[in-house]
Amino acid sequence: MIKSELVQIIASRNPHLFQRDVENIVGAVFDEITNALAEGNRVELRGFGAFSVKNRPARSGRNPRTGETVDVEEKWVPFFKTGKKLRDRLNGAV
């Protein structure tokens, strides 16, 4: 599913909302999650999961094509940990 499909589904389930309004709401939710992560904060959606950022320290890597050793810089990466309700639903428990 892509963002536009999500917007269409939400709009169809809520006929009192215009699709443009749903697009704005979904965009605002994603923007706020992104902003919180950029500030180093954790975003928890109970039952669904938690978004956070983790640090990947600098390390030596290898170019798979040439075998040459390269330095990989330190970086921050997004991380998602599923909530119990989501895990249970995916594994058949309801």
Curated annotation (Swiss-Prot):
GO annotations of cellular component type: chromosome; cytosol
Biological-process GO terms, alphabetical: DNA recombination; regulation of DNA-templated transcription; regulation of translation
Transcription in keyword set: yes
A molecular function GO annotation: DNA binding
Stored SMART domains: BHL (SM00411)
Keyword Cytoplasm assigned: no
Disulphide bonds in the chain: none
UniProt keywords, alphabetically: DNA recombination, DNA-binding, Transcription, Transcription regulation, Translation regulation
Assembly information from the UniProt record: Heterodimer of an alpha and a beta chain.
Family that this chain belongs to: Belongs to the bacterial histone-like protein family.
HAMAP family membership: IHF_beta
PANTHER family in alphabetical order: DNA-BINDING PROTEIN HU, INTEGRATION HOST FACTOR SUBUNIT BETA
Task of the protein: This protein is one of the two subunits of integration host factor, a specific DNA-binding protein that functions in genetic recombination as well as in transcriptional and translational control.
Annotated protein name in UniProt: Integration host factor subunit beta
Source species of the chain: Brucella abortus (strain 2308)
Gene: ihfB
